[in-house]
Structures are given as C-alpha cells and as structure tokens.
Amino acid sequence: MKAAKLLPILAIVALISFTSCANDSEENEAINSIEVPVTPQAKSIEIEIMELINAYRITEGLNALNNHNTVKAVASTHTDYMIEVNNVSHDNFFLRKQSLQANASANIVTENVGYGFSSAESVVNAWLASPSHRENIEGDYTDFDVSAEQNSAGKWYFTNIFIKR
C-alpha cells in the first residue's frame, strides 16, 4: 500500500529532474553551437593591415601572430553589423568572445575597431597612436585577423580581433 502511494510521487520527482537536466543541456548546446559564418576571401587592405601589425610587433620584440579563419569570419560579421547600423562600436562583443571561445579555443579575446581611414597604414597608425588600441596590438596573443568593408558611400569600417589559445 505504501509503495503504491509513493510511486506517483517518485514519478513526479523523476519527471521534474529529467526536465531540469534537459533544459541545462539545451542551454549548454545553444552556447556551444554559436554559428560561425563562412570565412570571406582576404582583401589586399586586410592583408596589408595584418602585415603592418606583425611588422610592428616584431620591431617591439614580440611574436608575429597567425591569421585565423574563424577569427576573420567573426570579425567580418561585426564589420557588416557596424555598416548596417552606421556606427562604429564594440556592440555584442561578448557574443564574439563566446563564439571564439567555443569555435577557436580562444582563452583571451580582444578587438580594435575603426572607421573612415582610407588605407591600411592610416588605420594601423591610428590604432598605434591610441594607448588602448596599441595595448591590444602589443598583447600576449597567438592569432588574429581583420575585416575591412566599405559602406555604400565608400567609407571603410574595420574590425581587428586578437585571441590567445
């Protein structure tokens, strides 16, 4: 008799437990499945930016950084976003960071953004003239990449992301 009364209660407890675990699992899957877009082909201005940054790092006694397709893809999505909203920003940086942690094994993520510069040299020089941007360029990272896109008026937008794996 006691077992017959306990069985429905145990069934309810089990149902609640399984439902709770399923939600935790779904949440973890959502975080781990942040989509990484297809990596766009590198433009000459992007290659030049990466070369200038690595040349600067070498003159400072730092290691050259490796370019990374996943970093480029994530940077590209942010550059497209800045063009879409017509504003230079670090909006949604935490999402880019989570994506790179999940998809590029990044432990540390930082970024520089820019707008309106007409050449690779001018945007890199502007970043180097800014203490916070220069700190990112000189940081202890392993990989980086950059996205440069023009809006409909021909103005350039830049996103440069650094990671340490």
Where are the predicted features?
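Functional surface patches built around histidine and acidic residues
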Residues: 21-165
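Bacterial N-terminal signal peptides that target proteins for export
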Residues: 1-8
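C-terminal motif of bacterial Sec signal peptides marking the signal peptidase cleavage site
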Residues: 16-20
